[in-house]
Amino acid sequence: MSDPVIKRALVSVSDKTGIVDFCRELSLLGVEVFSTGGTLKTLQDAGIAAASISTITGFPEIMDGRVKTLHPKIHGGLLAVRENPDHVNQANENGISFIDLVVVNLYPFEATVAKPDVTFEDAIENIDIGGPSMLRSAAKNNESVTVVTDSADYALVLQEMRNNNGATKRETRLALALKVFELTSRYDRAIASYLAGAQHEADSSMTVKLERELDMRYGENPHQSAGLYRLTDENGTRSFSDYFEKLHGKELSYNNMLDIAAAVSLIEEFRGEEPTVVIIKHTNPCGVAQAPTLAEAYRRAFSTDTQAPFGGIIAFNHPLDMEAATAVNEIFTEILIAPAFEDGVLEMLMKKKDRRLVRQTSALPKGGWEFKSTPFGMLVQERDSKIVTKEDLTVVTKRQPTEEEVADMMFAWKICKHIKSNTILYVKNRQTFGVGAGQMSRVDSSKIARWKASEVNLDLHGSVVASDAFFPFADGLLAAAEAGVTAVIQPGGSIRDNEVIEAADANNLAMVFTGMRHFKH
């Protein structure tokens, strides 16, 4: 059978990253777009001719949106086998039109239950019902229906439609369907774990299965053997190929895998935000920045430390465009990671044969358990995935932080948790200015961060400082004040908090407590 041309699309997303541009392109390709609730409003406000799902069902959205897509005219349009005459006749008799493309991502259940103040009622309201149902129907009928759950796949679908007379390829539809069942499996497991209380207390016994996925030449050092194993536990199965596709370069090493995990864990803090670039070396960020374009974000991240990025790993939260790729191409980097690569970018970057190019195909799972092996047993802990929002910040000084200071502090806090302790981090205008990582003394981390900034002539006046744990004494804060810092973000909780607060007030600093520590060993 020939690939079915996409004529009608059903779009309903919680994460609206890229959805306006995607649907605008679909409309230009002649696709009729139907949508629901907030997604419909977003599209119509952007001038896109999207119609309400109610025009298909003839039934309004009811019960605060709990019931809107659970309807025979939706699922019949998704599940009908186009080559089956009985299905086609029944569809015609019941006024059911085929739906060729489903674009759905789910209510953010995992992000919701990761909030420290989440209520049971909030958790329940964020259990998606209609979304998984549509995804599963579309994925089951992947012979005829294209299903997209991740904004990183928008570019791929559009490119195939342009090159294939409005259709996607069979192998693409199958790969996207596989992502659906992996997503819904993880989603249901997260709900079951939350309802069982498994997110808060490890069981007295666990069953974990490891299956070798990739062989490696050696481990952290040449004298150590190593491999990457697919892991199956109570949260499902996780493997490298579930989330990544290596597009170019020699085989990934043990150290590469550690750096990829570090880079992607950090860049995902900025999923759906402005263009952001993360540069990693030995699992620590040496530069992170956000800007209106990826190229500018890269240049700003690189300016934090102009030596460490050589041979490093760079991750992007938007598809890598030619301008940014050209800037990155000026130095040697081990790995570039992006959700997509725009036309011509891969061809240029592939000219350096030793560089690895990796496409992130889907978001890493949030929550779940983290395992660390020791010579005397396995340590198990919840992943450090809890989110601090602006509403969680407690201002403890006389001076309130400005909006710009709050924005910089939130940016710094997202990065801080991904740096080896002890961590002191200086940020200004959504750019790292000085990174002090992995020191036994918090004072030494502060000195290193200041020294790194001075080495590249970055002026710390007007910056903010983040500390992954409380300041045990006022000396660390006073050093930051001397450097020109105007605001401080830290967990709080020291027996000398009052002393530190007094020092902040004496220097007219704004300081906020997060109430959450981010040690990383």
Swiss-Prot record:
A GO BP term here is:
'de novo' IMP biosynthetic process
The pathway to which it is assigned is: Purine metabolism; IMP biosynthesis via de novo pathway; 5-formamido-1-(5-phospho-D-ribosyl)imidazole-4-carboxamide from 5-amino-1-(5-phospho-D-ribosyl)imidazole-4-carboxamide (10-formyl THF route): step 1/1; Purine metabolism; IMP biosynthesis via de novo pathway; IMP from 5-formamido-1-(5-phospho-D-ribosyl)imidazole-4-carboxamide: step 1/1
Q: Which CDD domains match?
A: IMPCH (cd01421)
- In the record, which residues are listed under signal peptide? none
InterPro entries this protein is in? AICAR_Tfase_dup_dom_sf (IPR024051), Cytidine_deaminase-like (IPR016193), MGS-like_dom (IPR011607), MGS-like_dom_sf (IPR036914), PurH-like (IPR002695)
PROSITE patterns noted in UniProt: MGS (PS51855)
Domain notes for this protein: The IMP cyclohydrolase activity resides in the N-terminal region.
Q: Name one GO molecular function term.
A: phosphoribosylaminoimidazolecarboxamide formyltransferase activity
Q: Supply the name of the protein.
A: Bifunctional purine biosynthesis protein PurH
Enzyme Commission designation? 2.1.2.3, 3.5.4.10
Primary gene name: purH
Q: Spell out the GO cellular component terms annotated for this protein, sorted alphabetically and separated by semicolons.
A: cytosol
What keywords were assigned to this record? Hydrolase, Multifunctional enzyme, Purine biosynthesis, Transferase
Specify the species: Chlorobium phaeobacteroides (strain DSM 266 / SMG 266 / 2430)
